[in-house]
Amino acid sequence: MLSFQRLDVYQRAIEFLVLTTELTESLPRGHTERADQLIRAAESVVRNIAEGAGRWSDADSSKHYKIARGETMECAASLDVLKLRKLVGVDRYDRGIQLLEGVVAMLTKML
């Protein structure tokens, strides 16, 4: 296991990606763009945490953690849109937001 894979923030981001994958697979036809955008943002969070952890300088690490934090906010906004459009249930929405709040809090401490 690589060092970034042991980070709590990485594990939480992976958990959100799993939830996102399940959620987007259950969307009705015609919402491919919304699903793709959410998946891309969730994957970007995971990738930027990993890349930030692998950088040698604090400035380089911080740059990637900031990107991951911004992508986390995009994921939350995407969940809000899905909720507004009644495309996600309350339980999945609440769990997703809970995971994202944890990711944001941890990334903020890492900056």
Give names to the regions the model predicted.
Residues 1-111:
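Amphipathic alpha-helical assembly/interaction segments
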